Curated annotation (Swiss-Prot):
Keywords: Membrane, Mitochondrion, Transit peptide, Transmembrane, Transmembrane helix. One of its GO terms (cellular component) is mitochondrial membrane. The gene is GEP7. This is Genetic interactor of prohibitin 7, mitochondrial. Residues 1-24 form a transit peptide. It is found in: Mitochondrion membrane. The chain crosses the membrane at residues 250-266. It is a single-pass membrane protein. Its main location: mitochondrion. Belongs to the GEP7 family. Involved in respiratory growth and required for cell survival in the absence of prohibitins or GEM1.
Amino acid sequence: MVLSNVKIFRLKSHRAFRIGPMIKAVAGNLLVKRFYQPKLERIPPASLLLKQKIRLAQNGSTTSTENPISFSQTMSEIFSVLQPSAPDLDEDETSGLKRDHLLTERLNNGELGVIMNKFFNPSSTHNNQLIDTNILLQNFPKLSGNDLDLLDFAINEKMRGNWNDLKQDFIQLWYYKSFGFLGPRTQFVLTNSSPSVRSQFLKLPFIEYNWFLLQNNKNANILPADVQNVVKVFHLDDKRFTWKSIDPFSKAIISFVVFVSIYVWLDESAKQKTKELPAQKSTVISE
């Protein structure tokens, strides 16, 4: 009996000797995972984030049909019946995300560089120089709607980063797209400038046309037709918006919407009260 007890004691002590370091190692790993969190410097690509947003938007639209009908959902259905031609917000959000994803793929594939090399002097773009002004004025109107969409998307994406990394031709194209070939200046071209510059200038918005007429030569003879093109006068109406001024059809729609809103609110409050009663009874029974 004594020998057997000694063997059992040695066996238990041997197991404890082997298990002790294992427990320490596991505890050390847990402490390291608990207090040490490595910093991930790599940022997920924009295309992956857009795909995730599209997937979440689609999942949200499918799961929303399984949830109970809420007040906002009821009102949206009412307005969709009253305005069948109104766009669906979920579909607009999903289509917008898909459009951003497509533009991101086009930008990552280098399509913007292909467009710039095609329309704006390839030699200057490769040497990181400015685009020739005549080429810019002649070829910029030739850009299609898809090209302009890609340019706008590239401007919005690249303006978030370091502007020192942008090429000069891209900055020039960005500047021209935003402000025109004259830029955001207080003085534009003289009234006695060449006809080609004047004709190109008159295609700009009317507020710059106003500067063109008045800034550089205040004594210039302005025709009444020019004043009508520059100045837009709006007269305020003395009539106020009141309930009596609404037409009967609009009154009927507003009254119907208010009635349905009150009905849905009363129904939701009644359901909430019925849910609270069993909970109160259960608490009383438990006490």
